[in-house]
């Protein structure tokens, strides 16, 4: 039984050293079961990789400092290290391309904000001055037009004011004007007859003086 087990281990291990098993009697079932139970466990245990051994050695050297030249990395650990170095190189190459932005409370941002506020204030002042200038210009033009109209209307007021006043505006005004004119004529006639009847000598003397003055001139 031990011979068969040894041949199986030689076929599986491909040159690996097999543990020595004590000789047991074939009649003992318990002794035969123990090697069979322990054999699969030892056969299934994986052999540690050389890269794992190298990593342990590197950690030991970093902690305690081991003398001697560093060992060459194994082929299994090589691609991962190369990949990590390439990734670091890309990150370092990308860092300068990122634009530097100022912090929210930095003096650069405060100066930019002050410049923007000053620009807005100047634009507001320019618009306000422009509006005031336009308003003053419109007021000045309005005053000039009103002054011209007053100058044109003033001569007409004195020259044709009486004529416009005497012109009747409607039929009632015409009736009033006629009544006043007839009443004036009637009152004048009565006054003349009263003067001649009461002061005829005085009236004759006044008429003679007017005639002499007219003839003398």
UniProtKB/Swiss-Prot annotation:
This is Transmembrane protein 247. Keywords: Coiled coil, Membrane, Transmembrane, Transmembrane helix. GO terms for cellular component: endoplasmic reticulum; membrane. The lineage of its organism: Eukaryota, Metazoa, Chordata, Craniata, Vertebrata. Residues 1-10 have a biased composition (Basic and acidic residues). The keyword Transmembrane applies. Residues 109-154 form a coiled coil. The chain crosses the membrane at residues 165-185, 192-212. The gene is TMEM247. It is a multi-pass membrane protein. InterPro entries: TMEM247. It is found in: Membrane.
């Amino acid at each position: 039984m031990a011979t068969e087990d040894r041949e199986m281990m030689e076929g599986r291990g491909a040159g690996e050293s097999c543990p020595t098993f004590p000789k047991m009697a074939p009649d003992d079932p318990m002794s035969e079961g123990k090697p069979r139970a322990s054999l699969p466990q030892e056969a299934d245990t994986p052999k540690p990789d050389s890269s794992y051994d190298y990593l342990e050695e590197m950690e030991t050297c970093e902690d305690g400092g081991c003398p001697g030249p560093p060992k060459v990395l194994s082929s299994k650990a090589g691609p991962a290290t190369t990949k990590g170095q390439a990734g670091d190189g890309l990150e370092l190459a990308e860092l300068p391309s990122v634009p530097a932005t100022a912090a929210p409370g930095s003096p650069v941002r405060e100066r930019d904000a002050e410049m923007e506020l000053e620009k807005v204030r100047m634009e507001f002042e320019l618009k306000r001055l422009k509006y005031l200038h336009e308003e003053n210009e419109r007021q000045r033009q309005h005053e000039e037009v009103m002054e011209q109209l007053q100058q044109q209307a003033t001569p007409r007021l004195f020259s044709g004011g009486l004529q416009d006043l005497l012109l009747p505006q409607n039929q009632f005004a015409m009736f009033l004007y006629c009544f006043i004119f007839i009443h004036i004529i009637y009152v004048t006639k009565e006054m003349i007859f009263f003067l001649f009847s009461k002061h005829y000598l005085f009236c004759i003397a006044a008429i003679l003086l007017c005639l002499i003055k007219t003839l003398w001139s």
